[in-house]
């Protein structure tokens, strides 16, 4: 894991330079014209890549901003790059202008003072963000304080092939019971892939009688006792997994391919609309559907953040603001595009803009907001950093 320990040594102050102010938006858009934004974002999904390419087309049309998608397999790689530039004294015109980020990676960059801002709450489209109803001002319990801007809402769902697994499974105990009776028919991406670690934290939240302790940082005094139910569960589950737990798909799309190939019947997703989009793109069978656990599932927001040493901060803010626009949000929510949840307040946008959202059909495999039920809070990032490391020591295999 490329995470937190090395940040403690970073004590040198960042060079203070004149920065574009989002409070003067005409000046920001004027400065942004002609700039290029290198957006470091996960590149493991063709639908996501296509959406980012569309964003690039739109911001070039409207603002003269060029958007380059730098495809990542691990967001921590971008964090490490900014850190390396900081250590080398490269405090201007860094290689990265914007990062798709949340959780422990955001926490690490924020603590190490590697982010530009605060900017998010001064962007024009912040006025239509649903601050009251969505978790857009905290990230895995860490206050964002304007250092990242939201662009999508996500919630854990489980995708199942109803031909072989017709009924939803209500909790982790039911998943274990089913997997034991149907060995080889379930798997999850190998941590530290974000979906793999998502399965681990969802399991822990579901197994604990009182998961509220996960809102606090993990400590040496609490960690072993709190995570004991998870390891007991995984010790029983692992031998029942696809390939007896001796191999794992590397990514979420690779996991879905196993359903498409008929090798497994159950997968985890962090996008309620992913199954519908995959069916529309012939990446999942028509029999695929989704469910959530009876006690609810984890939900969070996806954010973008701007490194402190970006040379295109104005253009990066333009892209961040466009991502929060009703146009971009409606496209992202379209189940044939991404199927992501919106960060917007439907009462704050115009009737014409709302009509676009109202016209979207959820699709055959997408649950309604009522069916998605209660959203469980993300654990503090410190839990998942330790759990992912421990998982590698206990169950990790070479890819």
Question: How would you label these PLM feature ranges?
Answer:
Residues 1-33, 399:
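Short, low-complexity disordered leader/linker segments with a strong preference
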Residues 20-23, 257, 364-399:
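Conserved C-terminal helix/tail region of periplasmic/extracytoplasmic solute-binding proteins
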Residues 42-54, 70-77, 92-96, 100-253:
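Extracytoplasmic ligand-binding site segments that recognize negatively charged/polar headgroups
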Residues 82, 109, 255-260, 306:
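Hydrophobic residues within well-ordered alpha-helices
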Residues 106-108, 267-285:
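A ligand-binding cleft/hinge motif common to bilobed small-molecule-binding domains
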Residues 154, 233-238, 284-305:
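Periplasmic-binding protein-like
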Residues 297-298, 302-371:
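Mature extracytoplasmic/periplasmic domains
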């Amino acid at each position: 894991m490329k995470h937190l320990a090395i940040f403690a040594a970073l004590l040198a102050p960042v060079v203070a330079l004149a920065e574009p102010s989002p409070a003067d938006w005409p000046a920001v858009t004027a400065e942004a014209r002609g700039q290029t934004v290198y957006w470091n974002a996960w590149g493991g999904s063709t639908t996501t890549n296509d959406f980012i390419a569309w964003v690039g087309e739109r911001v070039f049309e409207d603002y003269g901003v060029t958007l380059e998608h730098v495809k990542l397999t691990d967001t921590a790689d971008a964090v490490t790059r900014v850190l390396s530039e900081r250590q080398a004294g490269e405090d201007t015109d860094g290689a990265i202008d914007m990062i798709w980020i949340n959780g422990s990676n955001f926490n690490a960059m924020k603590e190490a003072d590697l982010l530009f801002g605060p900017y998010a709450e001064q962007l024009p489209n912040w006025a239509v963000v649903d601050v009251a109803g969505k978790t857009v001002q905290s990230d895995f319990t860490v206050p964002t304080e304007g250092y990242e801007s939201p662009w999508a809402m996500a919630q854990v769902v489980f995708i199942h092939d109803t031909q072989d697994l017709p009924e939803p499974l209500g909790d982790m105990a039911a998943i274990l019971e089913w997997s034991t009776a149907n060995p080889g028919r379930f798997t999850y991406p190998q941590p530290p892939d974000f979906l793999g670690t998502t399965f681990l934290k969802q399991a822990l939240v579901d197994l604990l009688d009182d998961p509220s302790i996960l809102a606090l940082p993990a400590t040496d005094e609490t960690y072993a006792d709190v995570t004991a139910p998870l390891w007991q569960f995984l010790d029983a589950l692992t031998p029942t997994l696809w390939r007896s737990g001796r191999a794992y798909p590397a990514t979420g799309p690779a996991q879905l391919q196993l359903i498409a190939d008929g090798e497994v019947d159950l997968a985890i997703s962090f996008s309620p609309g992913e199954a519908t989009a995959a069916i529309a793109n012939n990446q999942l069978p028509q029999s695929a559907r989704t469910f959530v656990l009876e006690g609810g599932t984890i939900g969070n927001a996806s954010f973008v953040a701007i490194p402190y040493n970006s040379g295109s901060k104005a253009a990066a803010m333009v892209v961040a603001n466009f991502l929060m626009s009703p146009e971009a949000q409606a496209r992202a929510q379209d189940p044939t595009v991404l199927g992501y949840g919106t960060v917007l307040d439907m009462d704050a946008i115009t009737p014409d803009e709302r009509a676009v959202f109202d016209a979207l059909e959820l699709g055959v495999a997408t649950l309604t907001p009522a069916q998605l039920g209660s959203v469980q809070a993300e654990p503090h990032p410190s839990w998942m950093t330790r759990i992912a490391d421990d998982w590698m020591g206990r169950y990790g295999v070479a890819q």
